[in-house]
Amino acid sequence: MRPLTEEETRVMFEKIAKYIGENLQLLVDRPDGTYCFRLHNDRVYYVSEMILKLAANISGDKLVSLGTCFGKFTKTHKFRLHVTALDFLAPYAKYKVWIKPGAEQSFLYGNHVLKSGLGRITENTSQYQGVVVYSMADVPLGFGVAAKSTQDCRKVDPMAIVVFHQADIGEYIRHEETLT
């Protein structure tokens, strides 16, 4: 368990900023305590400093997980967000997509969102912008990348992909043995 290097911090913050923008500051400076990011086995954990101090006397090879896993670094040093970060990204999301009840199951099985399943989309969402996907009842389901801008979504045919799937809460069941 170690702090992130400058390069790792930059790469991770750039990825998170795609989803929450300048609200990233609210994630780091919280009123309920000091939180930090720590790297363990190529995974980045978001943990309070109080819990970090308590875990300091546990050896690294015995430690499985600490705090909330935000994502992991790939072998090519790219950062990939995990669905476990959804609870922290959803309240601060700048760009949101709401999907119809009929499209929820398809999204939760790992499929992209089609125009026919799109309920609403935040105004001024640009193409390839990170978005948080909600049900029509405002329950966060996952996150993805906008395949089309808000203006383009109005004109495309119903079978066109409007949001590329990145992660969803169905992964808790599909990949339960690998999530930490």
Swiss-Prot record:
PROSITE patterns: PUA
Keywords: Nucleus, Ribosome biogenesis, RNA-binding
Annotated stretches, region: N-terminal domain: 1-92
Region C-terminal domain, annotated ranges: 93-180
A molecular-function term among this protein's GO annotations: RNA binding
Keyword NAD listed: no
Gene Ontology CC annotations of this record: nucleolus; preribosome, large subunit precursor
Domain of life: Eukaryota
Localization, UniProt: Nucleus, Nucleolus
Domain PUA: 94-170
SUPFAM superfamilies found in the cross-reference section: Pre-PUA domain (SSF88802), PUA domain-like (SSF88697)
Record GO biological process: ribosomal large subunit biogenesis; ribosome assembly
Family membership: Belongs to the NIP7 family.
Role description: Required for proper 34S pre-rRNA processing and 60S ribosome subunit assembly.
Protein name: 60S ribosome subunit biogenesis protein NIP7 homolog
Record organism: Rattus norvegicus
